[in-house]
């Protein structure tokens, strides 16, 4: 995900490869990052901390403390900005490892950022400035939609857009299975289902109409669509999706307390 965000920023001309430096304790991961972005690779966290003033923290949650403590020791009192995509790590936790000279922003991107169609949200820490928020928005906007929200809403963001791609994949798979059931070749069914969901989403974003209005526009009295919708309602699909988002949101809250 970190590579996707950096590559998006480079493609959008927000960053130049010559200004990007990276480090990963796994050498192969560092090499892959360099190949994807054209960035320079540092041999240690200490070297990285001396090379940049803005840091994208794209590590596993269990590595966050060690990485930030190292950064704090290496930077001293020199100002810096940390933008974290580490799942479940709160702003308070991030800030607790850092001196007051280092500002923090917490983000929740999703996997469609890998193809430039992400939906991300971010929250700013107590020491972050308006310029910091603008920098985070530019970075996240380079790979899709970016919204600033209060941190208390990031768990809901996780349940909705963070986990949402998996719900979408399941829906596409189910639609394709239904097409296969009625005679469509598998690959054709998948492409039709995926393009249909893409088209529906694009209509919502580009028309600014409520999804219910768009649904009504394609639902003729006594037609095929209303029969399909009635079957969805009868089988609780709407409720199942609401419960899926709620379950993922509650799990995100639990993980942030571990």
Regions found by a protein language model. Give the residues of each.
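Short pre-catalytic strand/loop immediately N-terminal to key active-site residues, enriched for Gly-Thr
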Residues: 105, 154-159, 211-216
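Internal alpha-helical scaffold of NAD(P)-dependent oxidoreductase catalytic cores
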Residues: 93-103, 119-157, 169-206, 251
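NAD(P)-dependent Rossmann-like dehydrogenase/reductase catalytic/cofactor-binding core
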Residues: 194-258
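NAD(P)+-binding Rossmann beta1-loop-alpha1 motif at the extreme N-terminus of oxidoreductases
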Residues: 1-50, 117-118, 180-182
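Hydrophobic packing residues within well-ordered alpha-helices of enzyme cores
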Residues: 5, 9, 30-34, 67-71, ...
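Rossmann-like NAD(P)(H) cofactor-binding subdomain of soluble oxidoreductases
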Residues: 21, 37, 45-122
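Small-residue helix-packing motif on alpha-helices
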Residues: 20, 30, 48, 64, ...
């Amino acid at each position: 995900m970190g590579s996707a965000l950096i590559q998006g920023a480079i493609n959008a001309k927000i960053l130049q490869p010559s200004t990007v430096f990276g480090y990963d304790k796994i050498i192969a991961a560092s090499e892959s990052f360099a190949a994807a972005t054209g960035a320079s690779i540092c041999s240690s966290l200490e070297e990285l901390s001396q090379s940049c003033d803005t840091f994208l923290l794209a590590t596993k949650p269990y590595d966050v403390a060690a990485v930030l403590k190292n950064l704090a020791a290496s930077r001293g009192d020199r100002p810096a900005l940390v933008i974290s995509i580490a799942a479940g790590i709160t702003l308070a936790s991030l800030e607790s490892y850092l001196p007051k000279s280092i500002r923090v922003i917490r983000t929740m991107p999703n996997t469609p950022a890998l193809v430039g169609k992400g939906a991300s949200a971010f929250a700013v820490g107590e020491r972050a400035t308006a310029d910091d928020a603008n920098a985070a928005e530019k970075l996240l906007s380079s790979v899709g939609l970016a919204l600033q929200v209060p941190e208390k809403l990031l768990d809901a963001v996780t349940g909705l857009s963070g986990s949402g791609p998996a719900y979408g994949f399941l829906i596409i798979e189910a639609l394709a299975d239904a097409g296969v059931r009625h005679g469509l070749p598998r690959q054709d069914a998948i492409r039709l289902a995926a393009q249909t969901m893409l088209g529906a989403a694009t209509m919502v974003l580009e028309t600014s109409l409520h999804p219910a209005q768009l649904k009504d526009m394609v639902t003729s009295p006594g037609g095929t669509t209303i029969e399909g919708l009635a079957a969805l309602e009868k089988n609780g699909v709407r409720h199942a999706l609401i419960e899926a988002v709620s379950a993922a949101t509650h799990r995100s809250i639990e993980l942030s307390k571990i």
